[in-house]
């Protein structure tokens, strides 16, 4: 299917059934108030479908269904082996429906179909399968105490988990939350972004088909200020887990404090530095990686390497290589398998990125590439790959998350200066350092205040590695066995023996 042509993908899109209803207690249904919102195709600005706009009334129904499912143990009370088998079946159904899920993802948020087929759809299924395998490998502990007692340390499911996920990787981010939450026995209410809700709605039906009991997995499309707020403030939600902007993350933490002090795990924004030292083992590979690290997924990536720090002694030749690779990233129709940069998710995001480009010009940064809207005849929301040089730490394009294909380049002389520049941010999600010197690699990776540090690569890793940030990039971790800890309570039981 990855060998389909643009015309073939367009034919499939024209005959695709688009999910549009909420999923509550095992059934698709309209919002209680009957309201809907428009789901727009970023590639052409046209209406895809109208989706149920849930609010507090729908949240109440979903929370009650999730709580009932948790209390009667229809999921958490199943033998681990059985839950594992059901989740494995869920993952397999996602794999069998890979083409549909990838197409929904591309149509809904504008990412290239090649990326949706090559990464998003398979990675989401792999996440569910990986967490399924972990279910019967979570062991409790016996504490070392005197012989007259038995001390147990056990983990139990939290209860009802509300997961609010972003629009840039809607399917993968949903599964990063859903996988470990289900694996540990919780009931889940998923609130996808109103900008890209379709894959979340589709996998709800696949979960039911796989055998996940009614009420255990619910999906509420709608807006953050309505249904999202209702979930965050609900007294019977035990955990709110979120990926999105730092601003909204802070608000959700406040909601936790104002309600029932529910667990609040926030994975937020980033302004990640990519440090290129003069002794990088392969400058061309580093330049190629640097282009991909900012332009992949239209730059709509929380870990995007949006700050490129290049040692001045190699900066001229490195920039020449970078520009050559950057010119290979051309904004085009997301359904064309050759496309590397698709459309921005909507008109609002496109305008925000264009504003930052103007800010960069006004601040005195040197525009080397791009900087314009493109493909306007399509009606879609496209921006050229953009590179600014001579960016100083005082500039807004150095400090603020743009969330688009805009790269800020800054020179430096020493490793110490690069680390200072790299850490000069409110965020701490990711960083990279390119060097052939092991001592510099270790020193740099230890000094950089980021949840993930890449050495001689960008965005390496798999499900075994935790993902999350330092500072205002959030708390808690997705992926790996550490993610399972977020969705459990730790219980101590002391048994006095005779």
What are the language-model segments listed below?
Residues 48-138:
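Glycine-rich loop-to-alpha-helix module at the N-terminal edge of alpha/beta enzyme cores
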Residues 1-51, 85, 89, 138-164, ...:
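Terminal low-complexity tails and localization/encapsulation signals of metabolic enzymes
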Residues 239, 247-392, 455:
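ALDH superfamily catalytic-core signature
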Residues 46-49, 237, 330, 357, ...:
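Conserved C-terminal structural/oligomerization subdomain of aldehyde/semialdehyde dehydrogenase
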Residues 48-54, 71-75, 163, 274-278, ...:
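Short, well-ordered beta-strand elements within core beta-sheets of diverse protein domains
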Residues 187-189, 367, 452:
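A short hydrophobic/small-residue beta-strand
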Residues 139-285, 412:
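Rossmann-like NAD(P) dinucleotide-binding subdomain of oxidoreductase/dehydrogenase enzymes
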Residues 45, 83, 105, 185, ...:
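Residue-level signal for inorganic ion chemistry
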């Amino acid at each position: 299917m990855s060998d389909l042509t643009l015309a073939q993908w367009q034919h499939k899109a024209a005959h695709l059934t688009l999910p549009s209803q909420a999923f509550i207690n095992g059934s698709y249904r309209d919002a209680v108030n009957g309201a809907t919102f428009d789901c727009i195709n970023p590639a052409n600005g046209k209406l895809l479908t109208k989706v149920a706009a849930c609010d507090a009334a729908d949240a109440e129904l979903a929370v009650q269904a999730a709580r009932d499912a948790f209390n009667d143990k229809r999921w958490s009370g199943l033998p681990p082996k059985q839950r594992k088998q059901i989740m494995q079946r869920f993952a397999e159904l996602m794999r069998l429906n890979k083409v549909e899920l990838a197409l929904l993802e591309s149509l809904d948020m504008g990412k290239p179909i090649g990326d949706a087929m090559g990464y998003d759809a398979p990675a989401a299924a792999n996440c569910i399968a990986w967490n399924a395998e972990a279910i019967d490998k979570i062991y409790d502990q016996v504490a070392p105490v005197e012989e007259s007692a038995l001390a147990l340390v056990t983990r139990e499911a939290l209860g009802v988990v509300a997961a609010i996920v972003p629009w840039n990787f809607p399917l993968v981010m949903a599964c990063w939350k859903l996988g470990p939450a289900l694996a540990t026995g919780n009931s889940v209410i998923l609130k996808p972004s109103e900008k890209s809700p379709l894959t979340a709605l589709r996998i709800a039906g696949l979960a039911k088909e796989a055998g996940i009991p009614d009420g255990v997995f619910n999906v509420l499309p709608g807006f953050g200020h309505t249904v999202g707020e209702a979930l965050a403030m609900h007294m019977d939600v035990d955990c709110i887990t979120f990926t999105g902007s730092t601003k909204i993350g802070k608000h959700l933490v406040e909601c936790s404090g104002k309600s029932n002090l529910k667990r609040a795990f926030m994975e937020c924004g980033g302004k990640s530095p990519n440090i290129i030292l003069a002794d990088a083992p392969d400058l061309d590979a580093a330049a190629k990686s640097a282009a991909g690290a900012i332009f992949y997924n239209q730059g709509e990536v929380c870990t995007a390497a949006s700050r490129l720090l290049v040692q001045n002694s190699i900066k001229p030749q490195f920039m020449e290589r970078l520009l050559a690779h950057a010119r290979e990233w051309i904004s085009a129709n997301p359904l064309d398998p050759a496309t590397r940069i698709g459309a921005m998710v909507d008109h609002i995001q496109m305008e925000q990125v264009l504003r930052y480009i103007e800010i960069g010009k006004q601040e005195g940064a040197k525009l080397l590439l791009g900087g314009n809207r493109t493909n306007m005849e399509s009606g879609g929301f496209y921006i050229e790959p953009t590179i600014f040089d001579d960016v100083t730490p005082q500039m807004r394009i150095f400090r603020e998350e743009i969330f688009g294909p805009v790269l800020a380049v800054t020179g430096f002389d020493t490793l110490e200066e690069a680390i200072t520049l790299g850490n000069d941010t409110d965020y701490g999600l990711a960083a990279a350092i390119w060097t052939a010197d092991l001592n510099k690699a270790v020193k740099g990776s230890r000094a950089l205040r980021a949840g993930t540090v890449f050495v001689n690569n960008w965005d390496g890793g798999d499900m075994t590695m935790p993902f999350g940030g330092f500072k205002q990039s959030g708390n808690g971790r997705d992926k790996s066995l550490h993610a399972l800890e977020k969705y459990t309570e730790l219980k101590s039981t002391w048994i006095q023996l005779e």
